[in-house]
């Protein structure tokens, strides 16, 4: 397949801006799902929505669209429709050759850059055909611990492997390892008392939680492992009350299952140790959930080699990277379906300064087109 034409590049940019302007925080993807499904249907492709909404709480399910190819082989291409929550409308604007949000909100390039690219591939295929059958999987609630992809039934796929395009780093990078991720919720239940008259009668839940957090190893624990406390709530607002309740949310993640399990176990121990401290004795409830599992691709994994070949064909020097972030690829890999995550050139995802250059957006389109050729010829 030839590289994208100037007309295709212009259409890609226009479509990207239109998609970014459609609000789609996780759980509220109906509007963008309807837009994308409608466009694919008008192109003549079969589109189906699954029942993931029932389990994820989203407004709609995942979309699966099939684009027939000139061979009887198939490959899956994945992007997610949702974004992180945001306030206010998104107004995409071009600044110095790149797309940004005009306001103080996210742009939504995560992952609408990939959605736009896959839609551009579908537009090309509708006119010129495709060397291999393509299954587009457009998921919901990726930003909610990969909920949509985890609910997707990979048994519906004709493909034997696939690719996601959901890493905020320069085009050319290929993710070869991603972490296992645990989330911890700790609640401390003490007893209230007047802080100025009878503080001895109270048991401070905030003090207990603080001691637990202070004892934890947080930040980068080693080259492959991180831990963080992300939020804490407690007390009733008055400084004259010994607080009887406090809770916090934390996480640990690592490319090593052994390391992350050790880290999360130590965090749990610190919670109970703090609850047993005579200075702030509290009842402690700790809930730990494994939200997704990690993976590490083999050196000669076919998907990795195909991605690298496609990148070289487009003039990029491939670079294999390890990441501390998760993507739908984690969910597919956990379900036994090989999936390689390829960087999409976006920058500063989840921030008001989020950006993607036109060069990166258009480059990804060329890479995906080349990738279909590589997979078809493999």
Where are each of the predicted segments found?
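N-terminal capping segment at the start of a domain
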Residues: 1-27, 290, 347-351
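Metal-dependent amide/peptide-bond hydrolase catalytic core
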Residues: 4, 42, 205-378
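A non-catalytic alpha/beta surface segment that caps or lines the substrate-entry region
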Residues: 25-72
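Acidic, glycine-rich active-site loops and adjacent beta-strand->loop/helix elements
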Residues: 53, 81-83, 137-145, 167-169, ...
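Catalytic-core environment of secreted peptidases
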Residues: 63-109
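Alpha-helical metal-binding/catalytic segments enriched in His/Glu/Asp
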Residues: 77, 96-143, 182-188, 198-219, ...
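Glycine/charged-rich beta-loop-alpha catalytic/anionic-binding loops adjacent to active sites
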Residues: 92-105, 189-193, 314, 346-350
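Acidic/histidine-rich catalytic neighborhood of metal-dependent amide-processing enzymes
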Residues: 103-179, 221, 226-229, 234-240, ...
């Amino acid at each position: 397949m030839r590289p994208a034409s100037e007309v295709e590049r212009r259409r890609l940019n226009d479509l990207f801006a239109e998609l970014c302007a459609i609000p789609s925080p996780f759980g509220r993807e109906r509007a963008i799902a309807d837009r994308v499904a409608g466009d694919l249907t008008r192109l003549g492709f079969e589109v189906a929505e699954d029942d993931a909404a029932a389990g994820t709480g989203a407004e709609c399910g995942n979309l699966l669209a099939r684009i027939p190819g000139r061979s009887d082989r198939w490959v899956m291409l994945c992007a997610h429709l949702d974004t992180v929550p945001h306030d206010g409308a998104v107004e995409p604007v071009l600044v110095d050759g790149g797309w940004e949000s005009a306001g103080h909100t996210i742009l939504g390039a995560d992952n609408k850059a990939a959605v736009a690219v896959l839609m551009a591939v579908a537009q090309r295929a509708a006119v010129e055909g495709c060397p291999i059958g393509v299954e587009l999987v457009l998921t919901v609630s990726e930003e909610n611990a990969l909920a949509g992809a985890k609910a997707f039934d990979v048994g519906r796929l004709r493909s034997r492997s696939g690719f996601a395009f959901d890493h905020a780093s320069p085009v050319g990078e290929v993710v070869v390892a991603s972490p296992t991720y645990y989330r911890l919720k700790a609640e401390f239940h003490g007893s209230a008392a007047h802080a100025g008259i009878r503080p001895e009668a109270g048991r401070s839940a905030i003090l207990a939680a603080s001691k637990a957090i202070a004892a934890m190893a947080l930040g980068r624990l080693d080259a492959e492992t991180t831990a963080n406390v992300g939020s804490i709530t407690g007390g009733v607002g008055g400084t004259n009350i010994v607080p009887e309740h406090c809770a916090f949310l934390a996480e640990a993640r690592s490319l090593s299952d052994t390391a992350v399990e050790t880290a999360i176990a130590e965090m749990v121990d610190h919670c109970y140790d703090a609850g047993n401290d005579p200075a702030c004795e509290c009842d402690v409830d700790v809930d730990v959930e494994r939200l997704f599992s990690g993976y590490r691709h083999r050196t000669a994994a076919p998907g990795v080699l195909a991605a690298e070949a496609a990148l070289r064909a487009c003039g990029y020097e491939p670079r294999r990277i390890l990441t501390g972030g998760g993507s739908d690829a984690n969910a597919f890999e956990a379900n036994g379906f090989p999936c390689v995550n390829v960087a999409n050139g976006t920058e500063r995802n989840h921030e008001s300064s989020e950006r993607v250059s036109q060069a990166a957006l258009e480059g990804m389109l060329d890479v995906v087109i080349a990738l279909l050729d590589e997979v078809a010829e493999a």
